[in-house]
């Protein structure tokens, strides 16, 4: 666990693809509990430590995750994420070049709970939620393409699903059509940055997570 930002109200970590944000059926220790122990030790606190979850990242995804250190920050950040006042930028490595190097994707997503998978459609249908993102090709190698994604809505598996529908499955994402897994078990989707107005100080905050320690990531991001 790597802490990449901290103030009196907020703490952010660079999540690896092996870590989970909140507890799940695996029983693995979540980042929220790791942070409580980290804060308790750092500040020598004898009692309980408050750490609130403000948003989530899928387990196989890496990058910025923001937690609240106070209840005031938690309630305000939860609302900011809900109404889209946190600008989230992702980087994704995909196997195919998009037909256009820059564009907007607008789809209707239907979530299948049993499969833990979402399906994208061109038109509205029952139980579908509108999903919007903008993407831009920012680098490429002989075999892979690095896309920067500005996420406008936060739907279940949205980026993974929409990029796959576009014909550009994310490297390592077997669930959405890539042909083989990554060695670390994750997928090549990275929450690169989060930018927002601080819920208490009202100053502009931008938190950036370094790319994963991987040769392909480093090669593609060297000029970014």
Question: What are these regions, as identified by a protein language model?
Answer:
Residues 1-224:
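RNA pseudouridine synthases
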